UniProtKB/Swiss-Prot annotation:
A biological process from GO: translation
One term of GO molecular function: structural constituent of ribosome
Keyword Iron: no
Gene Ontology, cellular component aspect: ribonucleoprotein complex; ribosome
Higher taxonomy: Archaea, Methanobacteriati, Methanobacteriota, Methanomada group, Methanococci
Record's protein name: Small ribosomal subunit protein eS8
InterPro entries associated with the record: Ribosomal_eS8, Ribosomal_protein_eS8_arc, Ribosomal_Se8/biogenesis_NSA2
Family: Belongs to the eukaryotic ribosomal protein eS8 family.
Record gene name: rps8e
Pfam families, A to Z: Ribosomal_S8e
Highest taxon of source: Archaea
Record's keyword terms, sorted: Ribonucleoprotein, Ribosomal protein
Length: 128
């Protein structure tokens, strides 16, 4: 069964709306690509609206970390997910989303990209 993101057929009171238009393909959704921290890298290319392509990062172990002091970027390996405000269970499952705090070779970094949408993990080094 697909994920549908259109208007609900029921009102808040439980009554039904009168159906005026049918369901459209543009209202379809997909399951989120929860980027896991593993030893290998796996991506999935999906066709989206307008014939464009979206690169979903499913598994990874590297991140592009920028050091704001030296203004340089370096590809480093990720060792652990330390914090994630999106969901507290993502820390235990090592799932990387935008805003997650990751432990890298350079130190702790905050993820600035959306790995499930852009296909890459970009992060900025945080000072503690």
């Amino acid at each position: 069964m697909g994920i549908w993101q259109g208007q609900s057929r029921r009102k808040a009171t439980g009554g039904k709306y009168k159906i005026v238009v049918k369901k459209h393909k543009k209202e379809m959704g997909r399951e989120s690509a929860e980027t896991h921290l593993t030893d290998d890298t796996k991506i999935k290319i999906v066709r989206v609206a307008g014939g464009n392509k979206k690169v979903k990062l499913l598994r990874t172990n590297y991140a592009n970390v920028m050091d704001p002091k030296t203004n340089t970027c370096k590809k480093v390996s990720i060792s652990n997910v330390v914090g994630n405000d999106a969901n507290k269970h993502y820390i235990r499952r090592n799932i990387i989303t935008k805003g997650a705090i990751i432990e890298t070779e350079m130190g702790k970094a905050k993820v600035t990209s959306r790995p499930g949408q852009s296909g890459i993990v970009n992060a900025i080094l945080i000072n503690e």
